[in-house]
Amino acid sequence: MFKTVREIILTSDAMSAILYPTVLVAEDSVDTRTMLKRAFELKGYGVFEAEDGRQALEIAKRHRPSLIVIDLNMPVLDGLETVRNYRRIEGEGVHTPIIAITAYDVYGMEEAALETGCNIYLSKPINLEELDRAVKSLGFLV
């Protein structure tokens, strides 16, 4: 009947994530990052950008985006290590959905991405319809 303050905050955060979703696009290629940014902005997402893994980790910790799309092969800190560190920071409980993207679709890469904590693995070049299906499969409305 009565909700605790914690329940109200969690409900508020969940509703905010649904109504005003944000995405962190972590990609070292300017062209790919720009394409992904525009695609998400057209669907109403607020977009944070990172060009390397260290930036991605800092932005993710600070802003807690609704979704992360991360290239697995980035400078400074690669995508797998970035995801591993972020999952450690998140701890138990609700985890931010993560879509891994890579041009290096070699044997074992998908398994490594999923074992590290990514929810979905996509190969480059990015097909926007496939990305859209992936995002929707994670429970996002757009």
For each of these PLM feature ranges, what is it?
Residues 34-42:
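Charged docking surfaces used in two-component/phosphorelay signaling
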Residues 1-24, 129-142:
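Non-catalytic signal-transmission and effector/linker regions of two-component phosphorelay proteins
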Residues 63-69:
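Active-site beta3 strand of CheY-like receiver
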Residues 74:
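Receiver (REC) domain active-site loop signature in two-component systems and cognate sites
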Residues 27:
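Conserved acidic carboxylate
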Residues 44-51, 59:
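Short hydrophobic/Thr-rich beta-strand motif most characteristic of the beta2 strand and flanking loop
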